[in-house]
Each structure stands twice: as structure tokens, then as C-alpha cells.
Amino acid sequence: MAFKHQLILSTAILLAVLAAASASFREQCVPGREITYESLNARREYAVRQTCGYYLSAERQKRRCCDELSKVPELCWCEVLRILMDRRVTKEGVVKDSLLQDMSRCKKLTREFIAGIVGRE
């Protein structure tokens, strides 16, 4: 009987720890905290340059993108790319369309490019 209670208690503690870790992860990968607005814009500019052919210094943009990404914890990298491709949150907390919404001509190519970046990791 004592073993059963100990097992239930251990399971409850484990579930509480997992729930706390999950909440902490969700709170950490939020624009404005670990994910800076500057880093989102740096990645947008680099992705657009690579796929849409706009003339910007490719090396400078790549360096800026990588520098900004290095400031974000690795566990948030996929969230950064998801925000870049699907939606964004302004400094005021307003949810907007994708940072690439205005690039409809290049959006598909840019999505493929971003998917390739994630696939390389």
C-alpha cells in the first residue's frame, strides 16, 4: 500500500515539474522577451534578399541575421522562424500577419528557403 502511495506521489511530482517546464518554455519564446523585434526584422531582410533578389549586401544581411539569432536561445529558433513565416506580434502585443505577407510574389520561395534553413540544423 505504501508503495502505491509513493508511486502516485512520485508521478504527481513529475507531472508538476513537466507542467512547470512546459509553461516556462512557452513564456520564454515570446516576442519581446528572448525573441527581439530587431532579430525578427534581421531574419526577414535576409530571407527576402536570398529569395526575392532584392539588392542588399548578402554578407552583411547574413551576418546581421546570424548575430541576432545567436542572441536567442536555441530552443526558440523554430518559434522565431514560425513567427517570421506565419505571424508576428508587435511591441504593443498586437498579432499581425506574417512579416512576409507583403512579399506575396516571393512568399512561396521564401517559405522553401526558411524550411531549408531549419532542415540543415
From Swiss-Prot:
User: MF terms per GO, please?
Assistant: serine-type endopeptidase inhibitor activity
Q: What is its main location?
A: secreted
Please list the disulfide bridges. Answer: none
- Sections of the chain in a coiled coil: none
* InterPro entries linked to this entry: Bifun_inhib/LTP/seed_sf (IPR036312), Bifunc_inhib/LTP/seed_store (IPR016140)
Keywords, ordered alphabetically: Protease inhibitor, Secreted, Serine protease inhibitor, Signal
**Cellular location of this protein?**
Secreted
Task: Show which residues constitute the signal peptide.
Answer: 1-24
Identify one Pfam family in the record. Tryp_alpha_amyl
> An example Gene Ontology cellular component term from the record?
extracellular region
**Can you tell me which family this protein belongs to?**
Belongs to the protease inhibitor I6 (cereal trypsin/alpha-amylase inhibitor) family.
Q: Which PANTHER family match?
A: TRYPSIN/FACTOR XIIA INHIBITOR-RELATED (PTHR34481), TRYPSIN_ALPHA-AMYLASE INHIBITOR CMX1_CMX3 (PTHR34481:SF15)
What protein is this chain from? Trypsin/alpha-amylase inhibitor CMX2
The organism that produces this protein has a lineage beginning with: Eukaryota, Viridiplantae, Streptophyta, Embryophyta, Tracheophyta
